[in-house]
């Protein structure tokens, strides 16, 4: 049974990023269908997988992390326009029976991601 999970770490503060809103979209051509919206818990994780079992299908997905709201709330944003606000990560799921973990490591001026385990 496959599943999709994520978590967010604040690399500037060296701790999990709690309270980050995340939207998951299924991408099909020009169509973007919102599948789920969650907020990270105190551990920077979601309380349940983003998708699992039959809900996870092979295809293209996009996670959109609302980093700007988090950076403002955590006192890491100055006045005016942020360098990073919404961070989209588009990725493919070739085999819906596998586990796909897509973490986000953020700071006010950079981010990184990878396929985790």
Question: Which residues fall in each region the model found?
Answer:
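Beta-strand-dominated extracellular/periplasmic modules and repeats
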Residues: 2-94, 101-103
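Compositionally biased low-complexity segments at domain edges in trafficked proteins
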Residues: 94-117
């Amino acid at each position: 049974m496959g599943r999709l999970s994520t978590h967010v770490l604040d690399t500037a503060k060296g701790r999990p990023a709690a309270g980050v809103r995340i939207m998951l979209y299924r991408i099909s051509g020009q169509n973007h269908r919102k599948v789920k919206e969650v907020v990270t818990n105190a551990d920077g994780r979601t309380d349940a997988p983003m998708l699992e079992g039959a809900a996870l299908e092979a295809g293209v997905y996009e996670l959109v992390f609302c980093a700007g709201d988090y950076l403002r709330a955590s006192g890491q944003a100055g006045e005016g326009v942020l360098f990073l606000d919404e961070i989209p990560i588009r990725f493919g799921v070739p085999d819906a029976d596998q586990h796909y973990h897509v973490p986000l490591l953020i700071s006010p001026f950079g981010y990184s991601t990878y396929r985790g385990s």
